[in-house]
Curated annotation (Swiss-Prot):
Pfam families: GyrI-like. One of its GO terms (molecular function) is DNA topoisomerase type II (double strand cut, ATP-hydrolyzing) inhibitor activity. The keyword Cytoplasm applies. This is DNA gyrase inhibitor. InterPro entries: AraC_E-bd, DNA_gyrase_inhibitor, DNA_gyrase_inhibitor_GyrI, GyrI-like, Reg_factor_effector_dom_sf. Keywords: Cytoplasm, Stress response. GO terms for cellular component: cytoplasm. Its main location: cytoplasm. Belongs to the DNA gyrase inhibitor family. Interacts with DNA gyrase. HAMAP family: DNA_gyrase_inhibitor (MF_01896). It comes from the Bacteria.
Length: 157
C-alpha cells in the first residue's frame, strides 16, 4: 500500500468514547455523533474514528475507540450534551494512506497499511492512537473513502 510520511497538526475533537467490538461500537458511536451534531447544529469539517488498541492483542470486548468531529480549539461543549467529551488528537509525524472501503471491511486496508509500514527502513510506528478521517458519506454512496493515520518516529538503530 502506498503511503506518505507527513507532519500533521494537533486536532481538537468532540464526540463519544466507547468500549467493545469495533464492528458495533464505531457504528453506534457515529449514530450518536450524528444526532448530537445535527441536534446542536455543530459546524465541523472532519468526521473521525480514533482507535486506541491493537485488535490482535486486546479482546474485542475491551477495544477502545472514539467517534468524533473536529472542532475549533476554543470549542465549548454545549449544555445537555450527555456523554460528549472534548479531547485532542496529537500532532506530529504520521504515515498517511487513502483507501476505499467496501462491504464495511475496514480491517483489510488497515492491515495492508500496517504491513506496508512495518517494511519501512526509515520510520517505525509510535505508541499513539491511530485514526481515520472519512472523506465521503458511505451511508449514501455505498462505500467509504478514508484517510488512515499512524503515528511514526524515526527508526532507532
Amino acid at each position: 500500500m502506498n503511503y506518505e510520511i507527513r507532519q500533521v497538526d494537533k486536532r481538537t475533537v468532540a464526540g463519544f468514547h466507547l468500549v467493545g467490538p469495533w464492528e458495533q461500537t464505531v457504528k453506534q458511536g457515529f449514530e450518536q455523533l450524528m444526532k448530537w451534531v445535527e441536534g446542536r447544529q455543530i459546524v465541523t469539517d472532519e468526521w473521525i474514528a480514533v482507535y486506541f488498541d491493537n485488535p490482535d492483542v486486546v479482546p474485542a470486548e475491551k477495544l477502545r475507540c472514539s467517534t468524533v468531529v473536529s472542532v475549533p480549539a476554543d470549542f465549548v461543549v454545549p449544555a445537555n450534551s450527555e456523554g460528549v467529551s472534548l479531547s485532542e488528537i496529537d500532532g506530529g509525524q504520521y504515515a498517511t494512506a487513502v483507501a476505499r472501503v467496501t462491504d464495511n471491511d475496514f480491517s483489510t486496508p488497515w492491515y495492508q497499511f500496517f504491513n506496508s509500514l512495518a517494511q519501512d527502513n526509515k520510520y517505525e510506528m509510535a505508541c499513539k492512537p491511530c485514526f481515520e478521517v472519512y472523506l465521503n458519506d458511505g451511508c449514501t454512496e455505498g462505500y467509504w473513502d478514508i484517510e488512515m493515520y499512524i503515528a511514526v518516529q524515526p527508526l532507532s538503530r
